């Protein structure tokens, strides 16, 4: 009986390992992959722009602090250096709300850009009132006038304004590349009391983007892409 029990338990362990291996080997390709989309391998010179979205005090010292905000900002600065090296335009985006609003109030301090992310004189600055920068600015008109076909997207928050920009850029015929670690978000507690932590929300947003709207890479991968 003991011998049978040992053999039975051993068989269960082996079955469990095999089942686990099978589960881990299972893949769920993105819609873009199934449609034949090829991951970006280079960026076209003169046709690529960098979007730097909402690196504002609200997300650092305001009512919506993002723990990974400083790291995302540091990586966005690396992307700006990369853009400068290859003469890519850098568009800074700032979200604004009416005076007296709880967040991003135009007459408050937290609506201002973070001290370490100040637009230069040469950088266009767009002020938006919608989640997506394309919804309340003339960004599309500006990009098309400049001959831009590819946009690198960075900013805060991943699930909102970054995903919104990617979602709107794709049907406007832009090739979208989101910088995963130059973006970040915060944990959210819903009205029903359920909470989603920042990492789960960040990863879910990136998965949504990669599924249907564009490529997702880390900053180190992006700055290694040839520009030609």
PLM region descriptions:
Residues 58-61:
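Short acidic, Gly/Ser-rich segments with clustered Asp/Glu that frequently serve as metal-coordination loops
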Residues 64-83:
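…and closely analogous acidic/polar surface helices at protein-protein or active-site interfaces
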């Amino acid at each position: 009986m003991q011998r049978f029990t040992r053999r039975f338990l051993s068989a269960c362990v082996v079955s469990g390992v095999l089942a686990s291996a099978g589960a881990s080997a299972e893949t769920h390709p993105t819609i873009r992959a199934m449609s034949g989309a090829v991951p970006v391998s280079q960026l076209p010179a003169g046709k690529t722009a960098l979007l730097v979205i909402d690196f504002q005090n609200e997300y650092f010292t305001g009512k919506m602090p993002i723990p990974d905000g400083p790291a995302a900002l540091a990586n966005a600065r690396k992307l700006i250096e990369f853009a400068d090296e290859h003469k890519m335009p850098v568009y800074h985006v700032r979200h604004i709300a009416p005076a007296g609003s709880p967040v991003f109030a135009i007459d408050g301090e937290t609506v201002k850009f973070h001290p370490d992310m100040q637009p230069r004189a040469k950088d266009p600055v767009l002020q938006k009132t919608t989640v997506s920068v394309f919804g309340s600015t003339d960004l599309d008109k500006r990009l098309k006038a400049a001959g831009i076909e590819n946009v690198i997207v960075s900013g805060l928050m991943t699930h909102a304004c970054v995903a919104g920009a990617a979602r709107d850029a794709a049907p406007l015929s832009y090739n979208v590349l989101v910088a995963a670690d130059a973006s970040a978000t915060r944990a959210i507690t819903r009205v029903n009391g359920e909470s989603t932590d920042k990492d789960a929300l960040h990863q879910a947003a990136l998965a949504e983007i990669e599924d249907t709207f564009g490529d997702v890479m880390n900053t180190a991968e992006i700055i290694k892409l040839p520009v030609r």
